[in-house]
Amino acid sequence: KEKQYFAPKGLPAEEKPLPPPKGETVAAFQNVSVSYRSVKGEPHTVFSRLNLEIHKGDKVALIGSNGAGKSTMMKLLVGLLKPSSGDILLNEKSIRDLKPEALSRQISMVYQNPEDMFIKDSIGGDIAYAMEVRRVPDSAKRTDELLERFRLKELKNRDGRLLSGGQMRRASLAIGVALNPGILLLDEPTANLDIATRKEIMRTLEDMKAITETVVIATHDMQLVCEWAERIIVLWNGRVVADGSRNEIFGNRDIVEKVGIRPPEIFSLGQAIDPDALCYTIDAFLNSFEGRFPNNENS
């Protein structure tokens, strides 16, 4: 059984989660500390001697409350922030030794605000440009394929900044895939969307699994986490306090209650009926409790 882990606030720094063994390591945090001074001059620590590995093929969700370190971790990986101490490796090479061009070929980030991904005056131009700067072969053909896959073909000549929320989000994801990185980071991909658009983007993210290698998502959307993630990393007070599957995370009440995770409503409803139930979707809920409720058709 994969080891579960919960760390109280005072846990010694050398004790850390032991994630399940996976494929080759493509990114590693080695004793990484990040700290800064507030506007009042007070010291603030985000991470203290953080150790963590991301493996090839991982589909990871980073979860935790605001200020837990999710965005900081992503910014460290793409070189937007530098650690106060420790090192970050990509494919066994320190990012300190990588030129920006070499770093961007290995890892790319799709920002929470999709508009930040648009440079050209058309979606087709943005996708093509992303591949041109990465020197991806057959970029014209690949652009058409991505426009088709992300249901953007009819919007090819539209300015991304003028699209609807869902269209804009799909376009930003297509650009992220076009960058062809070994590791793709997605910051809050379902934030600020209505219910229908959110479901559409969740389907898009699921489809992307077939054409992306390693993906890390930072999110507060627990339904997305439960339906999409194959590995969940829980951040709390600047520490990785849990690392495992959805059953290991949401089925561990210590983690859920002490870290303040809010499971999907359908999961909570299932637990209220049966504490051993682990239902993450409506279909799973109905299947789990089929026949346990009276038929009220004649009542």
Give the ranges of each region predicted by the language model.
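ABC ATPase nucleotide-binding domains
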Residues: 1-28, 256-299
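Catalytic Walker B motif of ABC-type/P-loop ATPase nucleotide-binding domains
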Residues: 184-187
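Conserved ABC transporter NBD signature motif
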Residues: 86-94, 103
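Conserved ABC ATPase signature
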Residues: 159-163
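Helix-to-loop junction immediately C-terminal to a conserved catalytic motif
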Residues: 78
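Conserved ABC ATPase "signature" region
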Residues: 137-155
